[in-house]
């Protein structure tokens, strides 16, 4: 499974690390739930590099992500 994430203003396709597929499923469930309820729930996906080829995919609401980045 691949995910498209926005990093440094550019979209990248990544392959989640084992176990990270659950986050993708959670993201799709939240998006689908928002469509069914006719409201918008925005989430921001980010990649956290641990050095080398290791990384993790994280999901956060944009306001929370801004607080972390500051």
Curated annotation (Swiss-Prot):
Keywords, sorted A to Z: Tumor suppressor
Tissues and organs where the protein is expressed, per its UniProt entry: Expressed in many tissues, with highest expression in prostate and testis. Reduced expression in esophageal carcinomas.
Biological process according to GO: negative regulation of cell population proliferation
Entry superkingdom: Eukaryota
Protein name: Deleted in esophageal cancer 1
The keyword RNA-binding belongs to this UniProt entry's keyword annotation: no
Functional summary from the UniProt entry: Candidate tumor suppressor.
Pfam families: DEC1
Alphabetized InterPro entries for the sequence: DEC1
């Amino acid at each position: 499974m691949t995910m498209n994430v926005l990093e440094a203003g550019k979209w990248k396709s990544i392959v989640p690390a084992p176990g990270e597929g659950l986050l993708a499923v959670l993201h799709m469930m939240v998006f689908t739930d928002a469509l069914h309820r006719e409201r918008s729930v925005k989430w921001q996906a980010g990649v956290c590099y641990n050095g080398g080829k290791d990384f993790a995919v994280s999901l956060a609401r944009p306001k929370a992500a801004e607080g972390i980045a500051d």
